[in-house]
Curated annotation (Swiss-Prot):
This is Acylphosphatase. It comes from Xanthomonas axonopodis pv. citri (strain 306). Residues 3-85 form the Acylphosphatase-like domain. Keywords: Hydrolase. InterPro entries: Acylphosphatase, Acylphosphatase-like_dom, Acylphosphatase-like_dom_sf. Belongs to the acylphosphatase family.
Length: 85
């Protein structure tokens, strides 16, 4: 299992972007979360197969859903490695 984190910016809060992202991730067999951030972006963390993560990244970069969203960019973000939980 692999994991990835993305930060999606633009008009992505208050337009059902997280719900649509969740639906897409579940359909791809991924687990994780999509959370609003104070700066107006959405933080997406997902785990699953490499192919499913690639598909989610492509969807995040091209998706026009929900229709009222105006995504300006989706970029991969780095995880901070933890020695212990």
């Amino acid at each position: 299992m692999q994991a990835a984190r993305f930060v999606v910016s633009g008009v992505v809060q208050g337009v059902y972007y997280r719900a649509c992202t969740r639906q897409r991730a579940v359909a791809l067999g991924l687990v994780g979360h999509a959370r609003n951030q104070a700066d107006g972006s959405v933080d997406v963390v997902a785990a699953g197969s490499a192919a499913a993560l690639d598909a989610l990244e492509a969807w995040l970069c091209r998706a026009r859903r929900p229709p009222r969203s105006r995504r300006s960019r989706a970029r991969p973000a780095r995880f901070r490695r933890l020695k212990t939980l």
